């Protein structure tokens, strides 16, 4: 059997080799990704696609390849930089772009005069994926660039695909979309399906088949006996069928028997005017098992101090229940991020756990 073998980003562990059977189609036939580029995002032979992410990751590679197949133009940036991105949009009159939410955050942290110095009116479609986007961030991007922002939820595994446009999102704030490939299910730890609105593991029912290279245990853990499969995320579905992601299952914190999803605190702290980047995760606590820790990269690293730590903790507690907020904050000059923009949170967690083992991984 012929297969396609790609590697995941490795944000929750070592990068996984994902083996997917090749479709039985002729070489020149339109593949699923190329079809979606036209149907969802309006890509055509006149498209100028700007890629701020490296091409060794599945999504940027497949989007660039798809644009080439339909005759469009691809511009690949050597690396992401917010000012250089705006310069490239203006210089090349880019019409289409795919980003991750961190790139939105970095763009919004620019001074207003810097943001307004560039003409981005050529943009027709901007897609983001790979991580949940804080609601205030997406609102501000739609206000800035207009209702041209799309979102999808999918993985290298190819077992399903959710999508929403700006109109969908504005009427269902926080959603990552409805399933357009596969059927969504939310299940509990025993594999039983949960009703609308309840939080559980996110699974797709589809004909997509995959396995992890040289890791049968990982492959088995991603699938239920009925064939449904998961990318490892936790979330819920509303009454209209829209999916909302809570966090990665591997990042869930269990503190004193309470399940805490660090994405909530990350979304809050990201919006503070002094914060450039943030990671929230569980660290060992003798009494509670785990406690919530934040590691923050400030816009001005010289401001790192106990006073700023107290300011950020207070800011978080004003918007979230105290149990969901960090007990302490450490400051770093830079957080470990994949060149695609994904956060390597596991590297930070490993520093704090040492020889201990998290009870959730």
Located regions from the model:
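Gly/Ser/Thr-rich phosphate-binding loop
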Residues: 10, 69-70, 94-99, 108-172, ...
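Conserved AMP-binding A3 loop
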Residues: 4-31
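Acidic/polar alpha-helix N-cap and adjacent early helical turns
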Residues: 350-361
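AMP-binding/adenylate-forming catalytic core of the ANL superfamily
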Residues: 87, 97, 154, 193, ...
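Beta-strand->loop->alpha-helix junctions that form or flank phosphate-binding loops
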Residues: 149-157, 176-178, 281-284, 330
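Short beta-strand->loop structural element characteristic of the AMP-binding/adenylate-forming
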Residues: 16-19, 73-79, 150
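Adenylate-forming AMP-binding core of the ANL superfamily, especially NRPS adenylation
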Residues: 132, 171-215, 222, 239-240
């Amino acid at each position: 059997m012929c297969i396609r073998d790609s590697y995941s980003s490795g944000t929750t562990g070592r990068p996984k080799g994902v083996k997917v059977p090749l479709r039985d189609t002729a070489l020149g036939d339109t593949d699923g990704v190329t079809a979606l580029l036209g149907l969802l995002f309006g890509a055509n032979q006149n498209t100028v696609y700007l890629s701020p992410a490296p091409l060794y990751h599945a999504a940027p590679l497949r989007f660039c390849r798809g644009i080439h197949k339909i005759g469009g133009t691809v511009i690949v940036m050597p690396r992401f930089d917010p000012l250089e991105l705006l310069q490239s949009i203006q210089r090349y009159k880019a019409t289409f772009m795919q980003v991750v939410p961190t790139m939105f955050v970095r763009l919004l942290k620019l001074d207003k005069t810097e943001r307004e110095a560039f003409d981005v009116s050529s943009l027709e479609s901007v897609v983001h994926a790979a991580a949940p986007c804080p609601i205030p961030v997406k609102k501000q991007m739609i206000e800035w660039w207009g209702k041209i922002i799309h979102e999808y939820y999918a993985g290298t595994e190819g077992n399903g695909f959710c999508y929403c446009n700006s109109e969908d999102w504005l009427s269902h704030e926080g959603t990552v979309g409805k399933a357009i490939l596969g059927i969504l299910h939310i299940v509990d730890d025993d594999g039983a399906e949960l009703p609308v609105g309840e939080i559980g593991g996110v699974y797709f029912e589809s004909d997509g088949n995959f396995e992890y290279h040289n890791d049968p245990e990982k492959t088995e853990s991603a699938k239920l006996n009925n064939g449904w499969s998961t990318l490892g995320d936790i979330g819920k579905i509303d009454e209209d069928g829209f999916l909302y992601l809570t966090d990665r299952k591997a990042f869930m914190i269990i503190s004193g028997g309470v399940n805490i999803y660090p994405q909530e605190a990350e979304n809050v702290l990201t919006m503070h005017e002094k914060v450039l980047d943030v990671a929230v995760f569980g660290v060992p606590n003798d009494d509670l098992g785990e406690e919530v820790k934040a590691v923050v990269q400030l816009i001005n690293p010289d401001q790192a101090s106990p006073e700023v730590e107290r300011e950020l903790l207070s800011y978080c507690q004003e918007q979230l229940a105290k149990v969901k907020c960090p007990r302490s904050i450490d400051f770093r000059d830079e957080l470990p991020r994949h060149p695609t923009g994904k956060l390597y949170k596991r590297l930070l967690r490993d520093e704090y756990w040492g020889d201990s083992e998290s009870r959730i991984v």
